[in-house]
């Protein structure tokens, strides 16, 4: 008997490993859009594989959507406003909406990292702040320009120890 559509394995819904942003050849994490596949519309849940030497996204913050990340496997680092923080399996990280705190997850190890990423989905008035990618941000209609002031540390938000 075929399983019902409300049961899915992340491997069966994982997307292609393609560059993540228009105009960039950089590859980011490889995501499986679980919530969308399961028909959930109000929350977003993704399984993310983060190969060595990659990050999940450009550093960003969101105005109206909260984000939650749980480390399933591996030892990533979370970049928060220019500082790296080491994580391990079982660690959770939360980003309340509207704070302007910018983040991305980076895999500076030789082993793959797996993350469970959850958040609110498709809020009409959500805006996104990309502090280190102003050219890309300028192309977006959902650019967040009136975010709270942020102060950034020395790390450039990219894989490696810079």
Regions found by a protein language model. Give the residues of each.
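Short, conserved beta-strand element in jelly-roll/cupin
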Residues: 47-51, 61-80, 118-120
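Short connector loops at helix/strand junctions that flank enzyme active sites
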Residues: 40-45, 63-66, 71-73, 88, ...
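Conserved short histidine dyad/triad with adjacent acidic residue
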Residues: 28-33, 46-62, 100
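A short, N-terminal "cap"/entry segment at the start of jelly-roll beta-barrel domains
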Residues: 1-42, 128-162
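Short strand-coil-strand connectors
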Residues: 41, 79-83
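Short acidic-glycine-tyrosine-enriched beta hairpin
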Residues: 82-98
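Ligand-binding loop in jelly-roll beta-barrel domains
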Residues: 39, 97-125
